[in-house]
Amino acid sequence: DSVASRGLGDVYKRQDALQGVDIPVFVKNPVNPDLELWMGAMERLNRAGVQRIAAIHRGFSSYEKSMYRNLPMWQIPIELHRRIPQLPIICDPSHMGGKRELIAPLCQQAMDLGFEGLIVESHCNPNAAWSDAKQQVLPAELDAILSKLVVRDEYTTTDDLQNLRAEIDQLDDQLMNLLSKRLRICREIGQYKKEHNLTVLQSNRYSEILDKRGKQGVQYGLSAESVANIFEEIHQESVRQQLKIINS
């Protein structure tokens, strides 16, 4: 059985119907990127006695223009795996990509991220398929896609890898220390704003930071979007702490 994306908000009927039935149940992700809703549906089924549950990642709807039918947003299934490590997560690259030429690279990305399986739509005559024709492949094409997949080992580690991870741990410690110092200065700025009756949000300054650090990030091989996301999170925490000071 499967619980579809649009049915996640009403799992109770399925929950009652599946009570005491020993069958595998696949729970598709919600249409919108809502990890708590996805997890909540699986938790309800588990409480009803369903033991064999797997998650199906089909991507998420978005108003953004994208090459994908549904945005992968890999960070959401990655977080799902972190929270429920024993849960099998299966990727549906057909619905995610929406185009047959995107299926192979999405399959490989899913394998690289440690997904337990794939659901790929295949049809003997894809162009004549009654639904989703553009995302279906011939059986021979599916065989070619699967034969070229590289399935990686999740757990085997070497001394070299352990040493590299130790370096990352040290750098993360330094990052946390620097972030702590940055926020301390932000709190001092918040105190200054309170004493001089200034607003917390200084839009021009924030835009200046995003522009400057975005360009700097690109020079270091990072995407401007990733840098913007990082500084947006830092800015939100800075604003939160300054609001606390101003309203104290």
Regions found by a protein language model. Name each.
Residues 1-12:
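Single conserved hydrophobic/aromatic residue that forms the stacking wall/gate
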Residues 2, 93, 122, 170-173:
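Generic detector of well-ordered alpha-helical packing
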Residues 10-126, 130-141, 157:
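Catalytic alpha/beta core domains of metabolic enzymes, predominantly
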Residues 17-34, 146, 150, 188-189, ...:
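P-loop/Walker A phosphate-binding loop and immediately adjacent motor/lid segment at beta-alpha junctions
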Residues 98-152, 200-228, 232-236, 244:
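Extended, hydrophobic interaction surfaces within ordered domains
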Residues 154-248:
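Domain-level signature for soluble enzymes in the chorismate/prephenate branch of the shikimate pathway
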